[in-house]
């Protein structure tokens, strides 16, 4: 399983420096929605990292898909956490609460 990161150039740069290979720069809402859809269809991606503010820019239909996604697990960074917490997402993906 791989980690994918989608966001503006500044957001993905840090992940590139950390060695994440699947990084996608999306500077406008249309490109963002297109790239998210592409990554959601990639069976090799286990975790998708997004900026919280980007979630507000995509269509509501895609937001619902992201909120209900088990694989890949969607992690949002920055601002208020959208939807479920990381703990809840991992619990849904793995089937076990790793914090207990």
Swiss-Prot record:
Recorded family membership: Belongs to the V-ATPase F subunit family.
Localization, UniProt: Cell membrane
An annotated GO cellular component: plasma membrane
Name under which the protein is recorded: A-type ATP synthase subunit F
Keywords: ATP synthesis, Cell membrane, Hydrogen ion transport, Ion transport, Membrane, Transport
Superkingdom of origin organism: Archaea
Gene giving rise to this polypeptide: atpF
KW Transport (keyword) present: yes
Function comment: Component of the A-type ATP synthase that produces ATP from ADP in the presence of a proton gradient across the membrane.
Lineage: Archaea, Methanobacteriati, Methanobacteriota, Stenosarchaea group, Methanomicrobia
NCBIfam families per the UniProt record, alphabetical: PRK02228.1
């Amino acid at each position: 399983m791989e980690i994918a990161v989608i966001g503006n150039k500044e957001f993905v740069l840090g992940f590139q420096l950390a060695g994440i290979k699947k990084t996608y720069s999306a500077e406008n809402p249309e490109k963002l929605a297109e790239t998210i859809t592409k990554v959601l269809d990639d069976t090799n991606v286990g975790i998708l990292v997004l900026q919280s503010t980007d979630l507000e820019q995509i269509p509501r239909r895609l937001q619902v898909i992201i909120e209900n996604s088990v694989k890949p697990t969607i992690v949002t960074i920055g601002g208020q956490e959208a939807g479920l917490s990381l703990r809840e997402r991992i619990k849904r993906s793995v089937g076990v609460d790793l914090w207990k």
